[in-house]
Amino acid sequence: MVIKAQSPAGFAEEYIVESIWNNRFPPGSILPAERELSELIGVTRTTLREVLQRLARDGWLTIQHGKPTKVNNFWETSGLNILETVARLDHDRVPQLIDNLLAVRTNISAIFIRTAFKNNPEKSLEVLTHQLTTENSADEFSELDYNIFRGLAFASGNPIYGLILNGLKGLYTRVGRYYFSNVQAKELALSFYKKLALLCEQKDTEHVMDCVRQYGKESGIIWHELQSPLPSDLEEVKR
């Protein structure tokens, strides 16, 4: 087990999460008692308590007063906020995880972008206004792309779409920094934003879904070309 965390709390959190992932503490099992676990990890019981509470909030554990702490089946109890952690823990499944992420983005954005153009065209055009060119960095493109999708999600008038994008941010922007290191990816994105802005200006909501789905297909092709070889840590990608 290789743990990169620097602080005692960070170390304890990574230790427990990796132990759950690797079935040292399998779903449905009971965690060791606080004293035993704190000695095993090498942190104080106060630090351990804070970590356990945080992991319970994220869905990894169930803590009930007077009862032992139970390990959850995190796929059933956690939220989108664990995606980055899962990507770090299981590099072999990262391509599949990201394929699923992109499919979800395409499917829900086809709905909320159309709704945003109907309900809030002025705000939508404001969100789509940018000054980027292919000369801008992958980091800048990743941030812009995320902000455009998130901005249009909130412009739809249904904040739940925005909250979903909030939950995806960590993994989304990490993937984006790698994806937008490719010039074709930048060119395709700029063309997509331009097409969306034109549809919004023309109040043409009928063709939004086709536009989004086509972008999903074309960006998916570029992504699959970039997957070999995929960096072991997307955070190490040149920005």
Swiss-Prot record:
SMART domains, sorted: HTH_GNTR
- Show the InterPro entries listed in the entry: FA-response_TF_FadR (IPR014178), FadR_C (IPR028374), TF_FadR/GntR_C (IPR008920), Tscrpt_reg_HTH_GntR (IPR000524), WH-like_DNA-bd_sf (IPR036388), WH_DNA-bd_sf (IPR036390)
A Pfam family recorded for this sequence: FadR_C
> Keyword annotations for this protein?
Activator, Cytoplasm, DNA-binding, Fatty acid metabolism, Lipid metabolism, Repressor, Transcription, Transcription regulation
Q: Which gene encodes it?
A: fadR
Query: Which organism's genome codes for this protein?
Result: Proteus mirabilis (strain HI4320)
The entry's localization annotation reads:
Cytoplasm
Relate the protein's function as given in its record.
Multifunctional regulator of fatty acid metabolism.
Annotated HTH gntR-type domain residues: 6-74
**Looking at the record's lineage, which domain of life comes first?**
Bacteria
Q: What is this protein called?
A: Fatty acid metabolism regulator protein
Q: Name one GO cellular component term.
A: cytoplasm
Question: Where is this protein chiefly located?
Answer: cytoplasm
